[in-house]
């Protein structure tokens, strides 16, 4: 029961761009999907207003949204349900979604337009490219990674997005005290996340002692249909929130 995440995976940083994972291994597989009329409308009519591209390069968040406000990025938003809910509930915060799958991007754009949201922008690009080339350093209030592909087979673990180089790249984009919030329904992946984060410099775990290393699901993370179905089936969900300390 895991959503797919839009980001490539990582290994050691390259000399040309310290802290940036190389592009070779991807944490996602692009699959052809049928588009509904609403999804197509989102891509065709709403994209020119809310869509962004790596080709546009680095821009200030103030330039993207026309104001200065806290900004949260979600990597791999799937069909966009939780991201739209958060943007609608928090008009004082700006949100950037990153997703490679066209149906999800189209669905998000259609819903954002129907709700009249102005605090949401979308990249249909590899998340590592966006983080590295587009988002300013020390600029983000938070980054969300909800239910990334767990790649459960051992031979595929290298495809998991949560790797040392990835979390270091995220750290450089977070403002001081900004947070990295991850959620997964695969306990083994949750344990992997903890292992990576506990070794990562410049982070601290925000979990209370009674539930550490995990945090109870925060109220600000919407409960999606996907997660609700999992709960009915008895699946667990593990949330982790780490804050940048420098």
From Swiss-Prot:
Any one Pfam family match given in the protein's UniProt record, by short name: Methyltransf_4
Positions bound to S-adenosyl-L-methionine: 74, 99, 126, 149
EC number: 2.1.1.33
Active site, per annotation: 149
Region (Disordered): 1-26
PROSITE patterns in UniProt: SAM_MT_TRMB (PS51625)
InterPro entries associated with the record: SAM-dependent_MTases_sf, tRNA_(Gua-N-7)_MeTrfase_Trmb, tRNA_methyltr_TrmB_bact
Uppermost EC category: transferase
Gene Ontology CC, one term: tRNA methyltransferase complex
Keywords: Methyltransferase, S-adenosyl-L-methionine, Transferase, tRNA processing
Pathway where it operates: tRNA modification; N(7)-methylguanine-tRNA biosynthesis
Entry annotated with the keyword tRNA processing: yes
Reactions it catalyzes: guanosine(46) in tRNA + S-adenosyl-L-methionine = N(7)-methylguanosine(46) in tRNA + S-adenosyl-L-homocysteine
SUPFAM superfamilies, alphabetized: S-adenosyl-L-methionine-dependent methyltransferases
Binding locations of substrate: 153, 185, 224-227
GO molecular function, one term: tRNA (guanine(46)-N7)-methyltransferase activity
PANTHER family: 3-DEOXY-D-MANNO-OCTULOSONIC-ACID TRANSFERASE/TRNA GUANINE-N 7 - -METHYLTRANSFERASE, PENTACOTRIPEPTIDE-REPEAT REGION OF PRORP DOMAIN-CONTAINING PROTEIN
Family that this chain belongs to: Belongs to the class I-like SAM-binding methyltransferase superfamily. TrmB family.
Function: Catalyzes the formation of N(7)-methylguanine at position 46 (m7G46) in tRNA.
Identification of the protein by name: tRNA (guanine-N(7)-)-methyltransferase
Organism name: Chromohalobacter salexigens (strain ATCC BAA-138 / DSM 3043 / CIP 106854 / NCIMB 13768 / 1H11)
